[in-house]
């Protein structure tokens, strides 16, 4: 029997897995804070709902990954303080992010998250950690589909030149 036999949760994590989890959680912490600010700026109720869904999902991901790190004697990255609620009308127009800008930023983040989850899955030796990243990947795929639908319905998509012939 080798060191990587048996229950994956009893196997040691390698530095790539640890770094992938730690970086993923750190990125989520930054996105949670940014999305809380976006909630304060957004006016579209559908967009606000998606932002709140993303925040909830990322907090759950961090909770699950934090348990894995702690079980392996590693301190998770620190979370940022929660942002207070504000009304979009109280933010000056020149300082406020517009809904299409917010949606565009989230779209970029979803794409980046898909790549980071895929990369992490590919370097994992522990099946349980790979499965956690696969779950996050699937959640991002589903979220991205909802966001794409919202972007199309609101007219927030700016496509490249379309081939119409």
What are these regions (language model features)?
Residues 2-4, 67-104, 108, 163-165:
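Carboxylate-rich helix-loop segments that flank metal/cofactor sites and access channels
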Residues 115-162:
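A generic hydrophobic-segment detector
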């Amino acid at each position: 029997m080798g060191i990587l036999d048996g229950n994956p949760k009893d196997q040691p994590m390698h530095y790539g897995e640890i770094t992938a989890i730690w970086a993923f959680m750190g990125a989520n912490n930054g996105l949670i804070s940014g999305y809380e600010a976006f909630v304060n700026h957004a006016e579209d109720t559908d967009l606000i709902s998606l932002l709140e869904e993303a925040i909830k999902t990322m907090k759950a991901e961090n909770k699950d990954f934090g348990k894995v790190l702690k079980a392996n004697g590693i301190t998770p990255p620190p979370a940022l303080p929660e942002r207070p609620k504000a009304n979009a009308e109280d933010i000056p127009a020149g300082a406020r992010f517009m809904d299409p800008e917010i949606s565009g930023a989230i779209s970029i983040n979803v794409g980046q998250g898909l790549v980071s989850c895929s990369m992490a899955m590919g370097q994992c030796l522990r099946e349980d950690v790979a499965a956690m990243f696969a779950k996050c990947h699937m959640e991002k795929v589903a979220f991205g589909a909802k966001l794409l639908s919202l972007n199309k319905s609101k007219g927030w998509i700016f496509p490249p030149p379309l081939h119409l012939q």
